[in-house]
Amino acid sequence: MHCRSLPPIANPGSWVLILGTMPGKVSLREQQYYAHPQNLFWRITAEILGFDATSAYPLRVSSLKDHGVALWDVLQSCTRESSLDADIETSTIVPNDFDRFF
Protein backbone atom coordinates (compact mmCIF):
# COMPACT_ATOMS: atom_id res chain seq x y z
CA MET A 1 0.00 0.00 0.00
CA HIS A 2 1.37 3.41 -0.98
CA CYS A 3 1.03 5.90 1.91
CA ARG A 4 1.17 9.70 1.92
CA SER A 5 1.67 11.59 5.15
CA LEU A 6 -0.80 14.00 6.67
CA PRO A 7 -0.10 17.74 6.52
CA PRO A 8 1.79 19.15 9.48
CA ILE A 9 -0.09 20.58 12.44
CA ALA A 10 1.75 23.72 13.53
CA ASN A 11 1.53 27.40 14.33
CA PRO A 12 4.28 29.92 13.55
CA GLY A 13 4.97 30.02 17.30
CA SER A 14 5.29 26.26 17.76
CA TRP A 15 8.38 25.41 19.75
CA VAL A 16 8.02 21.63 20.13
CA LEU A 17 7.84 19.33 17.11
CA ILE A 18 6.69 15.75 17.71
CA LEU A 19 7.66 13.50 14.82
CA GLY A 20 6.29 10.17 13.77
CA THR A 21 7.47 8.06 10.85
CA MET A 22 4.24 7.64 8.87
CA PRO A 23 0.66 7.54 10.15
CA GLY A 24 -0.88 4.11 10.51
CA LYS A 25 -3.71 2.79 8.37
CA VAL A 26 -6.44 4.03 10.74
CA SER A 27 -4.92 7.51 10.93
CA LEU A 28 -4.60 7.71 7.15
CA ARG A 29 -8.17 6.53 6.66
CA GLU A 30 -9.51 9.02 9.23
CA GLN A 31 -7.05 11.76 8.16
CA GLN A 32 -6.22 12.32 11.83
CA TYR A 33 -2.94 11.92 13.66
CA TYR A 34 -2.88 9.07 16.20
CA ALA A 35 -6.42 7.95 15.36
CA HIS A 36 -6.11 4.29 16.36
CA PRO A 37 -8.13 3.81 19.57
CA GLN A 38 -5.27 1.88 21.20
CA ASN A 39 -2.77 4.68 20.60
CA LEU A 40 -2.09 6.55 23.84
CA PHE A 41 -0.84 9.78 22.28
CA TRP A 42 -3.98 11.86 22.87
CA ARG A 43 -4.54 10.54 26.39
CA ILE A 44 -0.96 11.28 27.41
CA THR A 45 -0.77 14.74 25.83
CA ALA A 46 -4.19 15.64 27.25
CA GLU A 47 -2.99 14.68 30.72
CA ILE A 48 0.18 16.76 30.35
CA LEU A 49 -1.40 19.80 28.69
CA GLY A 50 -4.74 19.75 30.50
CA PHE A 51 -7.33 19.20 27.79
CA ASP A 52 -10.05 16.60 27.24
CA ALA A 53 -8.66 13.62 25.31
CA THR A 54 -12.18 12.67 24.22
CA SER A 55 -12.98 16.03 22.63
CA ALA A 56 -13.41 16.29 18.87
CA TYR A 57 -10.23 16.07 16.80
CA PRO A 58 -10.23 19.78 15.80
CA LEU A 59 -10.38 20.76 19.49
CA ARG A 60 -7.49 18.44 20.39
CA VAL A 61 -5.46 19.87 17.51
CA SER A 62 -6.27 23.40 18.67
CA SER A 63 -5.11 22.52 22.19
CA LEU A 64 -1.77 21.30 20.85
CA LYS A 65 -1.30 24.48 18.82
CA ASP A 66 -2.26 26.64 21.81
CA HIS A 67 0.53 24.96 23.77
CA GLY A 68 3.14 25.43 21.03
CA VAL A 69 3.17 21.78 20.00
CA ALA A 70 3.49 20.78 16.34
CA LEU A 71 2.97 17.33 14.79
CA TRP A 72 4.37 15.91 11.60
CA ASP A 73 6.04 12.86 10.13
CA VAL A 74 9.54 12.17 8.91
CA LEU A 75 8.26 10.60 5.70
CA GLN A 76 6.21 12.29 3.01
CA SER A 77 5.43 8.96 1.38
CA CYS A 78 6.38 5.30 1.35
CA THR A 79 5.04 1.86 0.58
CA ARG A 80 4.22 -0.63 3.33
CA GLU A 81 1.70 -3.41 3.83
CA SER A 82 0.86 -2.83 7.49
CA SER A 83 1.07 0.07 9.93
CA LEU A 84 4.46 -1.11 11.21
CA ASP A 85 7.59 0.90 10.47
CA ALA A 86 9.39 -2.43 9.99
CA ASP A 87 7.24 -3.06 6.90
CA ILE A 88 8.27 0.13 5.10
CA GLU A 89 9.97 -0.67 1.80
CA THR A 90 13.12 1.44 2.11
CA SER A 91 13.46 1.93 -1.66
CA THR A 92 10.12 3.82 -1.64
CA ILE A 93 10.93 6.32 1.12
CA VAL A 94 10.44 10.01 0.31
CA PRO A 95 11.27 12.31 3.25
CA ASN A 96 9.26 15.39 4.13
CA ASP A 97 10.72 18.79 3.25
CA PHE A 98 12.01 19.98 6.62
CA ASP A 99 13.90 22.93 5.14
CA ARG A 100 10.60 24.34 3.92
CA PHE A 101 8.86 23.52 7.21
CA PHE A 102 11.41 25.36 9.36
Indicate where each model-derived feature is located:
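A polyanion-binding, active-site-adjacent surface
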Residues: 1-102
